[in-house]
Design a protein with these regions (language model features):
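Hydrophobic h-region of N-terminal signal peptides that target proteins for export
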Residues: 10-18
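Intrinsically disordered, low-complexity boundary segments flanking structured domains
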Residues: 11, 53-57, 147
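Surface-exposed repetitive/solenoidal architectures
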Residues: 20-84, 105, 125
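Sec-dependent signal peptide recognition
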Residues: 2-8
Length: 240
């Protein structure tokens, strides 16, 4: 029995010794993870896109508390930091132009977020299930809020949608249960299916005359007043 214990300990020590703490994450990018949970992405250019079948090398990074991205990184890949549940701080530099699908999905300890004006694309479900996120400002470089981008951000109370946005995707803010009000800018023409569904605290929505398409169930299971401008004949003001 003693020999079995010794073998098990040796095996565990070997696994620990072989655990990777650095490597590559793009053609010209490297990553390094410290023992105290700081993940650094360094180099120049775009990150690799990851997926369910091709996880990032630091996946299952419950100990990642902070992410530092060099100011020469241009894209954050799909699924890059998915389920980094202990993450509380991330800097997104002004060099980043695109944030991939599911990039920060399930980062449930992230409370605040600054998206720089360099970002033009925020992928589908990029920040979904960031349960502790309380506010977010979307830069005026973004034209589309993708499907599910901020869905199930349960603590989100405030969101700023800039005048550059023309489309709010399906489920973009679905199940943001703490969101109390939202102003849709006059640049928006399309609001997708279930975009604000299950936003149970939502009390007011202003829909501008620019909106020509409101998809099914956009405000499903919400108790709210929505107002439109006088010139918006397609969606007159109602009290539901």
């Amino acid at each position: 029995m003693k020999q079995i214990y010794i073998l098990l300990i040796a095996l565990l020590m070997g696994l620990s010794a072989n655990a990777k703490s650095s490597g590559t994450c793009g053609p010209n990018l490297k990553w390094h993870l410290t023992d105290d949970g700081v993940l650094t992405i360094s180099g120049k250019g775009g990150m690799t896109d990851y997926s369910y079948s091709n996880r990032s090398p630091w996946y299952d990074g419950q100990n990642i508390k902070r992410i530092i991205i060099d100011d020469s990184v241009t894209t954050i890949g799909d699924d890059a930091f998915n389920e980094c549940s202990a993450l509380t701080s991330v800097n997104i530099p002004n060099s980043v132009r695109a944030i991939g699908n599911d990039a920060f999905r399930g980062c449930s300890s992230l409370t605040s977020l600054t998206i720089p004006n360099s970002v033009t694309t925020i992928g589908k479900y990029a920040f979904s299930y960031c349960r502790a996120l309380t506010s977010v400002t979307i830069p005026n470089s973004v034209t589309t809020i993708a499907d599910g981008a901020f869905g199930s951000c349960y603590a989100l109370t405030s969101v700023t949608i800039p005048n550059s946005v023309t489309t709010i995707g399906d489920g973009a803010f679905s199940s943001c249960g703490a969101l109390t009000s939202v102003t849709i800018p006059s640049s928006v023409t399309t609001i997708g299916k279930s975009a604000f569904s299950y936003c149970r605290a939502l009390t007011s929505v202003t829909i501008p005359n620019s909106v020509t398409t409101i998809a099914d169930d956009t405000f499903y299971n919400c108790i709210y007043n929505h107002r439109t401008t006088k010139t918006n004949q397609k969606y007159p003001s109602v009290n539901l």
